[in-house]
Amino acid sequence: MESFNERVEKLRNLIETSDHIIIGAGAGLSTAAGIEYGGERFKKHFADFIKKYDFTDMYTSGFYPFKSEEEKWAYWALHISVNNVDMPATGLYGKLLDLVEDKDYFVITTNVDDQFFKSGFDPDRVFATQGTYAKIQCANACHDTLYDDADFVHECIEKTDADLKIPSELVPVCPVCGREMMPYLRADDKFIEDEYWHERSDAYNNFVLDAKYDKTLLLEFGVGFNTPIIIRLPFDAYNMNFKNWNLARFNRSHLEYSVNIEGRYHLYPLEASSRLPEGIMDSYLPFDEDMECIIDKLLE
């Protein structure tokens, strides 16, 4: 791997000379921005829940089988508040906008914290594939209306009692079928892909197609292997198959490159890069350094 400064300068040149930039963002970007799901931030906001349920972080606690809707929404209201509704724009996302705002860019993200919108990215250039904490939906997906949840979240937090339950009358129920509601997050086949979702999906896919033969830079931030089929695997394929494309991957621990061979994905760590198809490493820039430090250097 080239030196840090060499990679930064190469990336600087690619940003300046590329016709299009596609940003792919996963949880690692928000973690780098300070929206951590564990550690002191988790302990600060969820001390009572940790004491009652032995929670260890916000990711695993999201799968906890609460015994009642009153308990479930006491937790989720605080989770949604801390990570979206009452979480302002972060500096790192703002710097990322500074880096690309004068370019023809598009964002695809699996994050549900709305940081791209809060930080001033053009909403018409963002596709949030997995939903948003800022809305709730019918858990049975009986209809495709989504509901803003900010006022509901604040009232739940205000009225959560010592047993970490909200009043029964606050529990949201679907206005159509009368069943329970859930945060608007992709968890199963009940996730609602409404008209707006499909508009954003089409806009992203059209952007990719229109850029196919142009010089295009893929910037992938903090994407792991929870849902690699959305960003990571396609980015590797685009970079390998589209002649004028380049990929910069920012990841503290996963810089592997994936190659689809007869329908099966094979991962190649950097130390095995010599086994990759010829030319791949000429268009692949891996970074395991601090994301904000890299962006700061690019903005100099």
Where are these regions (language model features)?
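Conserved catalytic alpha/beta core of Sir2/sirtuin-type deacylases, generalized to analogous enzyme cores
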Residues: 1-300
